[in-house]
Amino acid sequence: MIRSLLSFTAIAMLLSACAQTPLRGTGDLGVVVERATGSLQIIESDTHTALARVEGLGDLSHASVVFSRDQRYAYVFGRDGGLSKVDLLSARIDRRIIQGGNSIGGAISQDGKLIAVSNYEPGGVKVFNARTLEQIADIPATLLPDRQKRSRVVGLVDAPGQRFVFSLFDTGEIWSADFSQGPTPRIERFTGIGQQPYDALITPDGRYYMAGLFGEDGMAQLDLWHPERGVKRVLGHYGRGQARLPVYKMPHLEGWAMADRHAFVPAVGHHQVLVMDARRWQPVDAIAVAGQPVFVTARPDGRQLWVNFAYPDNDRVQVIDTQTHAIVADLKPGPAVLHMEFTARGDQMWLSVRDGGEVQVWDPYRLERLATLPAQSPSGIFFSSRAHKPGY
C-alpha cells in the first residue's frame, strides 16, 4: 500500500513538472502595439513569430512602451491615461491603472524603480513605483493664463543621475526632475526656451536633451553635464522654414540617428534627411529622399539608416549608406509603414505595415524579407533590449 502510494505521488510530481511552462529568457522578446484593438502581440525575434496577444489595454492610438531592467515586464502608456504593466512570460496584465485623462508617453528611471508618465490632461508628470504602480510623486505643470488648465507635457525621457527631463508645450519650458535623493524630486526649470516644444530626445551618451519647436525654427538644447549654462538655441534652420510648408506628420525626434559622429535628422516638411556634425551641431549635408521623413533609424553598427515617410509616401522605406549618403535601397513594404525597430545586434529589421495588417521581418544586410506576421492595425514595435538604452 505504501509502495503504491509513493509510486502514485512520484508519477503525479513528474506529470506536474512536465506541465509547467519551461524556463526561458526574455532577451529576444518584444511587443507590437495593435492600436485599433487596444492589444499587444508578444513577439520572438529568434523564430520570427508571435507568441501571444494581450488585450484590454485601452486606447493605444499613440502608445509607447518601456521595459523593466530584467526585461520581463513591458510598461504600456496609453493615450487614455492608462498605465499597464504586462508580464511578457505569462502574457497577461500584471497591473493596470488609469492615472490621467490624456497621456503622451513615459519613461523608466535609471535604476528601474520609477515609472514616469507625461500628461496632456491634467498637465504634468506623475511618477509611480515600478513594481506596484503606486503613485510616488505628482509634478503639476505651469498654469496657463486662464488659471484653469496647466501646460501639456511632451518629450519625457530618463536621464543619468536618476532624473527625468521633459518639455512644457504651451509655456515653452524644459524641466528636470531629480529623484536621486528620494521620492521628493528636486525640480529645475528652464523658461523661455522657444515656442511650442513638441517632442524631444536625449543623445545616446545622455548628455544633451534636444527639444524640437513647432512654433518657430530651431531646437532648444540643454547640456545635462552643465545645466547651469542654461538652454541654448541650435540648428536655427531646423523646422518648416519661412515658406511654412505643409507638414503631414511631425517627425518623431526619437527617430534621430547617431552614426559616425553625425546626427541624421528627419527634416520638417521637406523631403530631406539633414546631416549634422554632432560635436558642433552644425549642418554638413542634406540627403534628398522620397517624402517627408518620420523616423530615421540607424542600424546598431551605424552603417545604415532606414527611413519611413508621412502620407502620401508612407508605403515606402528607403535605406541610406551613412558613409556615402547614397540611397542604396528603395523598398515598398506595403501601405502605411508606421514604425521600424532593429533587433539589438542589428541582424533583423521589423516593420509595422498598418493598412496591410501585418508586421514584416527583414534582413538589413541582404535587404530581403524573412517573414510576415499578421497583426491588427500594428503601429509601434518595441524589443525588450530597450531596457538598457538611456532615453528609451
Go through the PLM ranges and name each one.
Residues 1-4:
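Positively charged n-region of N-terminal signal peptides that target proteins for export
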Residues 18-392:
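Predominantly soluble domains enriched in secretory-pathway, periplasmic, or organellar proteins
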Residues 7-16:
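Bacterial N-terminal signal peptides
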